[in-house]
Swiss-Prot record:
GO terms for cellular component: endoplasmic reticulum membrane. GO terms for molecular function: Glc3Man9GlcNAc2 oligosaccharide glucosidase activity; mannosylglycerate hydrolase activity. The keyword Hydrolase applies. Substrate binds at residues 94, 98-101, 146, 167, 227, 262, 415-416. One of its GO terms (biological process) is protein N-linked glycosylation. Transmembrane segments: none annotated. Belongs to the glycosyl hydrolase 63 family. It comes from Selaginella moellendorffii. The active site is at residues 229, 459. This is Mannosylglycerate hydrolase MGH2. Activity is not dependent on divalent cations, but it is enhanced by Mn(2+). It is an enzyme of class 3 (hydrolase). Keywords: Glycosidase, Hydrolase. InterPro entries: 6-hairpin_glycosidase_sf, 6hp_glycosidase-like_sf, Glycoside_hydrolase_63, MGH1-like_GH.
């Protein structure tokens, strides 16, 4: 591909969604930025159903050309976002190392240079706290383009180079895949052995600090910990957090991305209220669980943790780094039972729960499909989840939307309240294949291909138009293309 990778800002505002599959108009197609310099075919003006079920997916010259150009673009994006040992999600908007971003980015880096992929994970785990927690952001270098930075998070007795909360623990999943697919087996085995004790300590921290009552499912105490920051799943629980008299602040994200695509002020006020309260407690794990006014059972965190425990168990055997696997097996056994309490029979979907009320949180989100990725659903429940997913896909042009498109809080362009995220599509696709729903997995994969082809490499995508939105030249989207969508 000639010239630099282009990441032009989106220019279309999506409105509410109808209940029938929409048609992508020719006018919309013409103004969508095609970052990969591939002409949008005439079929882009046809119905989403026609595109979705194209029989020649992954066949023929168009896909071959698209693949070559996409791979080159994605390699350039990861190279440009490389800060020397760690990768930022996107320039300006996210200038630091994010936890689950880096773990997922390592999968893409492994398709380019294995040693660099291991360095990404090693750099992330080097920020681990003494208690085992791995923070959700590591502040390697100063930056004026992001708020809240280290000056807000720092406390007298805790590190000032990171945040005081965590994120979904993807790292063990990545370590296993890198080891399994390694060409340099000696390097991979050495790095897996080096990282295993840190991974085990992190998982132990989750159960000690976030499940002290031994339920089998861990708590999340801040929306930022979920990775799905402004998901409508948190609306009810977050609304009960009283807004404290917090210092005045200026959001930096709105200087990079349209406010219509970002969390709103009332949410940010509560995010910061929680932050300042946690800092006042010096991030003491013994106090946070009991004193936080926001405590939920997040499906994304728990599903990823369960899958990561499976992979940690595999790593224990593959590396010989752990002689007693009973602790890990205990975690998975308790979780297998506990996940049943999160299944909503009427909705045909798993739901998050408010731990302070014991009630389901009302919004249906894409996290409800992740128990397939974790492998915790029975055959009957998996069938119900697959049917629900099929209905969601029928309701939009491109899946998987991050919120049920029929829900009143669905917003097609606002961050985790509607847009499609390729990392979720990858996890759900893996889960569908795990349960034998290969055709549905291909449907998700085809939608993902169309999004990248017509929308570019963005943070997320509008499920109605396919427009790329949020941050441009986005690292984990590029990584998903390299490690999944266009992987040989």
């Amino acid at each position: 591909m000639a010239g630099p990778v282009r990441c032009l800002p989106p220019v279309v505002e999506a409105t509410s969604i109808p209940h029938a599959p929409p048609v992508i108009s020719k006018e919309v197609s013409e103004i969508v930025n095609n970052m990969l310099s591939v002409a949008i075919p005439a079929a882009a003006a046809a119905s989403a159903q026609d595109q979705r079920f194209a029989s020649q997916f992954r066949c023929g010259p168009e896909f071959a050309t698209m693949k070559a150009q996409a791979l080159e673009a994605c390699r350039k994006i990861l190279a440009e976002n490389d800060q020397g040992g760690y990768t930022i999600p996107a320039k300006g908007l996210y200038p630091y190392q994010w936890n689950w971003d880096s773990a997922l980015v390592s999968l893409g880096l492994a398709e380019m240079e294995e040693e660099r992929a291991w360095e990404e994970l090693d750099r992330l785990m080097s920020a681990q706290w003494e208690d085992g927690m791995v923070p959700h952001i590591v502040f390697h270098k100063p930056s004026s383009t992001y708020f809240p930075g280290p000056e807000i998070w720092g406390s007298p007795d805790k590190p000032r180079n990171s945040t005081g909360i965590t994120q979904p623990p993807v790292a063990a999943i990545s370590v296993r895949r890198l080891l399994e697919e390694a060409k340099d087996k000696a390097l991979a085995l050495a790095m897996a052995r080096k990282l295993f004790p840190k991974l085990l300590a992190w998982h132990r921290w989750f159960y000690r600090a976030r499940d002290p009552e031994g339920t089998g499912l861990v708590a999340t105490i801040h929306p930022w910990e979920t990775g799905m920051d402004n998901s409508p799943a948190w609306d009810e629980a977050l609304a009960r957090v009283p807004i404290d008299d917090i210092p005045p602040y200026v959001r930096r994200d709105l200087g990079h991305v349209d406010a219509k695509m970002r969390p709103q002020k009332a949410e940010y006020d509560r995010y910061l209220t929680l932050l300042y309260r946690f800092r006042a407690l010096d991030y003491d794990e013994a106090k946070l669980y009991y004193e936080t006014p926001f405590r939920v059972t997040d499906l994304c965190t728990n599903c990823i943790l369960h899958k990561a425990n499976e992979d940690l168990l595999w790593l224990a055997g593959a590396t010989g780094a752990c002689t007693d696997e009973s602790e890990i097996r205990g975690w998975t056994a308790r979780a297998n039972v506990a996940f049943d309490t999160l299944f909503d029979v009427e909705a045909g979907l798993y739901r998050c729960k408010d731990q302070l009320t014991g009630q389901f949180l009302p919004a249906a989100t894409s996290a409800g499909f992740l128990p397939l990725f974790a492998g915790v659903a029975s055959g009957e429940k998996a069938s119900a989840v697959a049917r629900t997913l099929g209905r969601w896909l029928d309701d939009v042009a491109y899946g998987i939307p991050s919120c049920d498109p029929r829900d009143p809080w669905f917003e097609a362009l606002r961050y985790w309240r509607g847009p499609v995220w390729l990392i979720v599509n990858w996890m759900v696709s893996e889960g569908l294949k795990r349960y034998g729903y290969g055709e549905l997995a291909q449907r998700v994969e085809r939608d993902s291909y169309e999004l990248v082809k017509n929308g570019g490499i963005f943070e997320y995508y509008c499920p109605l138009t396919g427009m790329g939105a949020g941050g441009g030249c986005f690292s984990w989207t590029a990584a998903m293309c390299l490690a999944w969508l266009f992987k040989s």
